[in-house]
Design a protein with these regions (language model features):
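Positively charged n-region of N-terminal signal peptides that target proteins for export
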Residues: 1-4
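N-terminal amphipathic, basic helical "cap/leader" segment at the start of enzyme domains
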Residues: 20-131
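Glycine-rich, acidic and aromatic/proline-enriched surface loops and short helix-turn segments
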Residues: 137-142
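Short acidic/His/Gly/Ser-rich catalytic and metal-binding motifs that mark active-site loops
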Residues: 143-147
Length: 156
């Protein structure tokens, strides 16, 4: 049993060390983009067809910053609120070449796994697989600590 645990620990550390070299540093978000919230909302619609070209790094940077970036560097607070300010939501970026975790503090993507996992996160919807990027938002409930107490606080 100890050998298995040691082997797993070595594997985790080697994967972490390998992934540390696989970072995409994002450009600073463009806070001067034109357009209004009302225009964006009025033009919002669903589609089942996606352009085959990749999203450029600047657009991806802006999208990630808007979704969960840090907009108050003095406090580390985000563009999106979170319950009890636990910052429980992580954004994963799934691209044809690999899956990445968005690191808001350093505004970069950290490789989690190489390979195309868009089909795995498509939820059985074949048309989603052709999208050049998928964003997966995951809530890490462990950040609330004592979940019974956190649930009581959240639900009143």
């Amino acid at each position: 049993m100890r050998k298995v645990q040691l082997l797993l620990a070595c594997l985790v550390f080697s994967v972490a060390a390998f992934a540390a070299d696989k970072v995409i540093k994002l450009p600073k978000p463009n806070l001067n983009r034109t357009g209004t919230v009302m225009k964006a909302l009025s033009e919002r619609h669903s589609t089942r067809e996606f352009a085959s070209k990749a999203l450029n790094l600047s657009d991806l940077s802006d999208l990630l910053w808007a979704a969960n970036g840090i907009n108050r560097s003095d406090s580390g607070k985000r563009t999106a609120p979170s319950a009890l300010n636990k910052q429980d939501v992580d954004v994963y970026v799934v691209l044809p070449e690999g899956s990445y975790l968005y690191d808001a503090k350093n505004h970069q993507l950290n490789l989690i796994a190489e390979g195309d996992y868009r089909g795995a996160v498509a939820g059985g919807q074949a048309f989603v697989i052709s999208a050049p990027v998928s964003l997966v938002l995951v809530s890490d409930l462990s950040r609330f600590g004592d979940t019974k107490n956190a649930h009581t606080q959240l639900m009143g």
